[in-house]
């Protein structure tokens, strides 16, 4: 069990520049939403549009490919990707609630938070960080065991992470 968790102060949008794992609308397998591959080469500033950058949906099982043009308002609803509105792949029921994550790094952050004995807020005050907005049932130490079991269930059904950091930036040393 981690001793400490330090809030990295990111919002839910900070997880959108990485792979978002979704259910393919055609074959129901695991598909991936990423920043469109041509986006980085077409602009001098890759971070210019951030969460509003063009996206691509690809399913390696059935070869479905779709594009989202970007620059429009993102639809943000729980357990769906904000670009194509597809159900997230990384989700499961947990004590009458739905536990979900956009991708591996998001799931890692949730696990780090839940396992920590001590949870520290970030240096800046405010309530806009994703961690500060987690639901009460997920934050409760009483639900720790059940939430960790749900995270393990999600991981068992997840495809391997393409890039796994050596250590999580959310863990305090």
Per-region residue spans from a language model:
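N-terminal cysteine/histidine-rich coordination modules
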Residues: 1-73, 77
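Residue-level detector of secondary-structure boundary/capping sites
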Residues: 15-18, 50, 101, 125, ...
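Generic structural hydrophobic/aromatic packing signal, biased to beta-strands
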Residues: 22-27, 31, 59-62, 66, ...
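Residues in flexible loops and secondary-structure boundaries
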Residues: 32-35, 39-41, 67, 107-109, ...
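General N-terminal targeting signals
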Residues: 39-41, 116-118, 123-124, 151, ...
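Amphipathic alpha-helical interaction surfaces
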Residues: 65-68, 116, 120, 144, ...
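Extended interfacial segments that mediate partner engagement and assembly in macromolecular machines
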Residues: 69-136
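C-terminal, charged low-complexity interaction regions
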Residues: 133-173
């Amino acid at each position: 069990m981690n001793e400490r968790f330090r809030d990295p102060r990111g919002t839910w949008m900070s997880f959108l520049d990485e792979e978002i794992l979704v259910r393919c609308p055609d074959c129901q397998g695991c598909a991936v939403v990423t920043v469109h591959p041509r986006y980085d080469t077409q602009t001098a500033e890759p971070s210019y549009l951030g969460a509003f950058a063009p996206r691509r949906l690809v399913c390696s099982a059935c070869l479905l490919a779709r594009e989202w043009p970007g620059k429009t308002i993102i639809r943000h609803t729980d357990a769906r990707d904000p670009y194509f509105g597809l159900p997230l792949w990384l989700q499961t029921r947990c004590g009458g609630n739905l536990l979900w994550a956009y991708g591996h790094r998001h799931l890692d952050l949730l696990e780090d938070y839940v396992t920590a004995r001590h949870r520290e807020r970030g240096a800046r005050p405010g309530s806009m960080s994703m961690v500060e907005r987690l639901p009460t049932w997920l934050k409760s130490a009483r639900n720790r065991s059940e939430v960790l079991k749900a995270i393990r269930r999600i991981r068992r059904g997840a495809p391997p992470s393409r890039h796994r950091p050596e250590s999580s930036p959310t863990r305090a040393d």
